[in-house]
């Protein structure tokens, strides 16, 4: 994103931490195929009288669909299909029970808060750990999900290695 273009943040130093931009925003990925598909979506929503948000039923699905609609500058009413099963009966019931998108605002805000928190943690902790504990020029990537997952994998590897070592010693 544009945050990396900020002159003050180009060099990695402890003095620049914490890195907190004045505002957060969304930006389309700079890839031709994605931009082309988004232009198709943008043209379709420009002429829509109503949109039915059929994104995944959950925080992440709500966030992604809202971001797409924000970037596409959706002006028409939006209703939400909320289903967790793809059976014919479930889909029919879901379309009979569409809700206004405002009913899901708190879910969107929760997802947005998580995304911003992940960014703040990731960029600041990655720079801190890379500068403090890494080798010059090497990045020690830190994140809310990846770091504890890696810790679980390392712990499991150590447990298996220790078990093999103990089994070898008793032979």
Tell what function each PLM region has:
Residues 1-119, 123:
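Intrinsically disordered, low-complexity regulatory segments
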Residues 3-7, 163-170:
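Conserved small/polar residues in nucleotide/adenosyl-binding loops
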Residues 54-56, 144, 168:
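Alpha-helical architecture
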Residues 91-161, 165-166:
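C-terminal or mid-to-C-terminal helical accessory/interaction module adjacent to the motor/catalytic core
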């Amino acid at each position: 994103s544009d945050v990396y273009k900020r002159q003050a943040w180009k060099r990695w130093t402890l003095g620049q931490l914490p890195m907190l931009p004045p505002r957060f925003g969304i930006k389309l990925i700079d890839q031709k195929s994605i931009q082309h598909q988004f232009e198709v979506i943008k043209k379709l929503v420009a002429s829509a009288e109503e949109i039915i948000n059929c994104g995944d039923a959950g925080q992440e699905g709500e966030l992604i669909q809202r971001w797409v609609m924000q970037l596409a500058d959706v002006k028409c009413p939006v209703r939400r299909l909320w289903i967790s099963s793809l059976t014919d009966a479930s889909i029919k019931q879901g379309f009979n029970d569409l809700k206004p998108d405002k009913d899901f605002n708190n879910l969107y805000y929760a997802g947005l808060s998580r995304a911003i928190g992940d960014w703040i943690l990731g960029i600041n902790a990655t720079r801190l750990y890379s500068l403090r504990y890494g080798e010059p020029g090497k990045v020690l990537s830190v994140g809310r999900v990846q770091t504890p997952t890696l810790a679980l994998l390392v712990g499991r590897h150590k447990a298996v290695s220790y078990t093999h070592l103990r089994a070898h010693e008793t032979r």
